[in-house]
Amino acid sequence: MNGQSIPPGEGILHHAEGVDLIPANIELAGLEVSLVNTMNREKMLKQVLDGAKREYDFILLDCTPSLGMLTVNALAVADTTLIPVQAQYLSAKGLEQLLQTVQKVRRQINPKLKIEGILLTMTDSRTNYGQQIDNLIRGAYGSKIKVFDQTIPRSVRAAEISAVGKSIFQHDPKGKVAEAYRSLTKEVMANAEKQLKRVAERGR
């Protein structure tokens, strides 16, 4: 922000489960305003991550559910975006606006940006309402964008993890949410392998 370079490894925490984290803090809330008058504001995060990418196989950016400058920064540096959508009517309505933002970023900033898929979260298949939202999103977008078969169910145990400071795999390793994320990981990786095969076949 102030033109000073960031030392390598600054702010990175090494977690016992084998991942590195850069946690957010309360100051992030004011960063959105600070970016308004910043030169090259859409690529501030890219400048930081370009130096760190060589150290990692994958970097995951967890964005807030908003379409502000922080989210635009994440889209500007990302290779692909996985879009989580809560199984609620208002979240489903907001999906179209997010997709428009992705298209705009692709046109103006990051032409290589791809949509990995849509992930339904906090689902409850036991209720008619939950099934209706699932059908609504799959019906509206499933022909254009991959909607993952695996969903992430609503769970009290998952809601507890922020308070206990553990991942769902530590806190409730055999629970339905942990199992759902394992299944999702397999689905994402399988989808990526299919895409790589299609690219290889086109190149022959």
Describe the residue ranges of each PLM region:
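P-loop NTP-binding core
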Residues: 1-204
